[in-house]
Swiss-Prot record:
Transferase is among the record's keywords: yes
Molecular-function GO terms, alphabetical: formylmethanofuran-tetrahydromethanopterin N-formyltransferase activity
InterPro entries xrefs: ForMFR_H4MPT_ForTrfase, ForMFR_H4MPT_ForTrfase_C, ForMFR_H4MPT_ForTrfase_fd-like, ForMFR_H4MPT_ForTrfase_N
NCBIfam families found in the cross-reference section: PRK02114.1
GO biological process, alphabetically ordered: one-carbon metabolic process
Family: Belongs to the FTR family.
Name of the molecule in the record: Formylmethanofuran--tetrahydromethanopterin formyltransferase-like protein
Keywords, sorted A to Z: Transferase
Length: 296
């Protein structure tokens, strides 16, 4: 298959079931919202057993629970330990959102399968001086801080979601890496319910490693700088100098497929994109398979 002269490899992306908390951050101004949203989702950590997240969308004041500018963010955890998820999530909230002036955090998880109680790992930052109050039909924890005050909904919903859908766009030149990638990120951002936790990712990985304590290491057959060293074992196509990846997490398979389609169709508008492929583990590890030809 080709789109605008770009070859779409007949392969698939492998994705995994994880748990997701979707929340809405608000603040007095959009600059603070952006800082809180990007800081709290800045480190993709699923492959090392930590929380990862992404910014789904930004909102005007008339679209949020408290009539202030806001952002919807998603936080994912790949392991079944719900208590560990709560602890990891609390680090993001306490260190990246609570510390920003005039912020609040609201539950926005659709159709939650359960709820996390925010008092134990976040509310008690008030050291016993925190209190519960009602706001707009929501039960909020008010945490007294030096710039009064941080408010967080007492229960945050979580649900099963899908992590790790991806596609690679193989480029001829560095300009295309950034231009096509940024355009694809913007196109994916128009799809409700998905995030791109790595933005443009320059380091595809593999599960096999010579150094187990590192975790996933570089996917060496796809490193252009190793083409000559690897010889026939290199999988970098002729003319390709760069293989960036875009990883997508989403609340549903349907949303992920729509996002994959939007991203792939966008990168194929650029002459410097020679081929589109995807990362997988031969279908042995992931719960979900997204065929590239099937979504286009």
């Amino acid at each position: 298959m080709e789109i605008n002269g770009t070859v779409i490899e007949d392969t698939f992306s492998e994705a995994f079931t994880g748990r997701c908390v979707r929340a809405t951050i608000t603040a007095r101004d959009m600059e603070t919202v952006r800082r809180a949203a990007y800081d709290s989702t800045a480190t993709p950590g699923a492959v090392i057993g930590r929380v990862e997240g992404g910014v789904e969308s930004f909102h005007s004041a008339d679209e949020t629970p408290d009539g202030r500018p806001g952002a919807t963010v998603q936080f994912y955890y790949a392991l079944p330990d719900l208590e560990k998820f709560q602890v990891e999530l609390s680090y993001r909230i306490r260190q990246d959102i609570l510390v920003k002036p005039f912020t609040a955090l609201y539950n926005s998880t659709p159709d939650p399968e359960g709820y996390m109680d925010m008092m134990k790992h976040v509310g008690h930052c008030g050291d016993g001086y925190e209190w519960i109050e009602e706001f707009g039909g929501r039960e909020m924890i008010n945490i007294p801080i030096a710039v009064p005050d941080f408010k967080i909904e007492s229960k945050m919903g979580y649900r099963d979601a899908i992590m790790g859908a991806n596609f690679w766009y193989m480029c001829r030149d560095p300009e295309t890496v950034l231009e096509a990638g940024r355009a694809a990120i913007n196109a994916i951002g128009e799809v409700e319910g998905v995030v791109t936790p790595f933005d443009i990712c320059s380091a595809a990985s593999k599960p096999e490693t010579n150094y187990p304590w590192i975790g996933p290491t570089t996917n060496h057959p796809y490193c252009p700088s190793l083409r000559d060293l690897l010889g026939d074992k290199s999988k970098v196509p002729e003319g390709v100098g760069y293989i960036p990846e875009i990883v997508i997490n989403g609340l549903s398979l349907e949303a992920l497929e729509e996002a994959m389609r939007a991203g792939i169709e966008t990168v194929c508008r650029y002459d410097g994109v020679l081929m589109v492929s995807a990362g997988n583990y031969d279908g042995k590890l992931g719960d979900h398979r997204i065929d590239l030809h099937g979504v286009l």
